Amino acid sequence: MNPSNSSNADNPLGIAPIGSLLAKFAIPAIISMLVNALYNIVDQIFIGQGVGMLGNAATNIAFPVTTISTAAALLLGIGGASNYNLEMGAGKEHKASEIAGSALTTLVITGVSVAAIILLFLHPLLVFFGATDTVMPYATDYVSIIAIGLPFFTLSVGGNHLIRADRSPTYSMMCTLTGAIINTILDPLFIFGFKWGIKGGAWATVIGQVVSAILVVIYFTKFRKMYLDRSMLKPKLIHLRAITSLGLASGINQIAIAAVQIVMNNILRYYGAASVYGSDIPIACVGIVSKVNMVFLAICIGISQGAQPIWGFNYGARKYDRVRQTYRYSATACTIIATIFFLCFQLFPHQIVGMFGGGSNLYFKFAEKYLRIFMLLTFANGIQPMSAGFFTSIGKATLGIIMSLTRQVIFLLPLVVIFPMFMGIDGVMYAGPIADTAAFILAVVFARKELGKMKNA
């Protein structure tokens, strides 16, 4: 018997109970995603407490930098991991390892390139991202430091997807968790103890990212399960095409998020100036809500990422019943989590906003109203990102891209531009639930159609 086929037949991805298998992969993935979200949220909380509203506004202006870097990391990390699992499921171990090697090297190259571009064009980029004159000094201090850590951030985020694909979800979780703990310890020390202000928050983040990246490198040099030699680390165009094909959905989704952030910041700057709130209050408040929403999305995307090796392997092995069952379990989990977050957003908006520092009555009035209205359809908002991951993991790149684009680009982006023309700054709030409803309906339609095909196969 071919050893690859024998290994394939014994692989727990194809034979273990779906519930326990999904928990094994999803829980570490959720923790890793939450930790990645906390890199931003912990900074925002300490900066909000130590610097104030302008610090919150500055981190919101800087957020597209992190989002764009995440796009590169997910493009290569998820694309590499999805291809790796599909090839392993088909018994092509050598090709799978070559794909992983190409992804790892390209992650480093891309991270360095993004950092260089941001540092070279820092001021015009911050203006483009929506910075006001008041916020600009804070944003410049923050982003000029954050950019230094982007190569490490990109390797850490993308590399952890490959570590999970290599059947080491716990190590992947440990990589991100260690960096986040270091970041959390250093934030108050640098911001309050050393009185570095917003620069302290940035340096704490960078140091945490460096530690996470070092742990990723240690895994692939000492603890990996896959076969990987130096020759496989040279990027091959044929593999990069396959990687970008399956990673494009996740990458485009992040780019779409960045585009919405940039457009929204500029809309808030323009319409905020004509409102009672001014420009800086809406920019700061929307940044806080975006960070809070990251926690919810981190859990749903973590469930999807935990399911992806199961979906990919079993689809490659033509075990379609297991693919369908995994989708049902994942969708149920996402819906339960989404409902819990919906209740928190509606019942405790003041407490949630208050974690990120104090402000005027106008500040809290806008923040609480925005959180309640913009996140009104949270209970239905977990299916769309999960479905994008589903289609990507089974090799349906086009459907994955469509799912990734629905909420951010197809629905939310136009609504964010159109609604304020008639409703002023309040129009931004109402764009959220309408976009969520449309994206949810589309995701359900596409997913049911694809799962129906598998049932009849």
Regions from the PLM with identified roles:
Residues 56-116, 153-172, 265, 283-343, ...:
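Small-residue-rich hydrophobic transmembrane alpha-helices
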Residues 19-38, 42, 65-72, 148, ...:
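Residue-level signal for short hydrophobic patches within transmembrane helices
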Residues 34, 38-57, 126-133, 189-196, ...:
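Helix-terminus/linker motif at the lipid-water interface of multi-pass membrane proteins
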Residues 77, 146-164, 172-183, 201-214, ...:
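Short runs within selected transmembrane alpha-helices of multi-pass transporters and secretion channels
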Residues 1-26, 84-151, 195-248, 311-376, ...:
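Short alpha-helical transmembrane segments in multi-pass integral membrane proteins
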